[in-house]
From Swiss-Prot:
Superkingdom of source: Bacteria
Taxonomic lineage of the native organism: Bacteria, Bacillati, Mycoplasmatota, Mollicutes, Acholeplasmatales
Oligomeric form and interacting partners: Part of the 30S ribosomal subunit. Contacts proteins S9 and S11.
Cellular compartments per GO CC: small ribosomal subunit
Keywords: Ribonucleoprotein, Ribosomal protein, RNA-binding, rRNA-binding, tRNA-binding
UniProt-recorded name of the protein: Small ribosomal subunit protein uS7
Protein's gene: rpsG
């Protein structure tokens, strides 16, 4: 343990178009090799495509999608008496959001559309409707936590 105190949490600046910190976080997750401009272009074009597909406010659709992706429970490995147990535990809100964003981008890249903006738009719309690969990942995580509920008393 470090004796120099706690590390201060860095705050992200809101993006210029939607004035939202959440959008900046998504752009930072999409970004590769420091190419933020390209990541912004991809995300903003994907939101335009989402608006065309759903005829709704794109940021609302994105928030609905993220709420459907963010997990509430996860399993963590705990070693007790020479055995490893998968112990279900709640996830704090910041980690829920970051996991949701990472899963969204990860499963978007695995999609078989032509361009990244098309893949991202399709995954956002699917997730907002409650289906899609990233929503399945959340359900799978919750299923694992439910199956290991018997070990919840090992929580720390």
């Amino acid at each position: 343990m470090s004796r120099k105190g706690h590390i201060k949490k860095r705050d992200v600046n809101p993006d210029p178009i939607y004035n939202s910190k959440l959008v900046t976080k998504v752009i930072n997750v999409i970004m590769q090799d420091g190419k933020k401009g390209k990541a912004q272009t991809i995300f903003y074009q994907a939101l335009k495509k989402v608006q065309l597909m759903t005829k709704r406010e794109p940021l609302e659709v994105f928030r609905d999608a993220l709420n459907n992706i963010m997990p509430v429970l996860e399993v963590r490995t705990r070693r007790v008496g020479g055995q490893n147990y998968q112990v279900p535990s709640e996830i704090r809100p910041e980690r829920r959001q970051s996991l949701g964003l990472k899963w969204l981008v990860k499963f978007t890249k695995q999609c078989n559309e032509k361009t990244m903006k098309d893949k991202l738009a399709k995954e956002i719309v699917d997730a907002s409707l409650g289906h899609g690969v990233s929503v399945k990942k959340r359900e799978e995580t919750h299923r694992m936590a439910e199956a290991n509920k018997a070990f919840a008393h090992y929580r720390w």
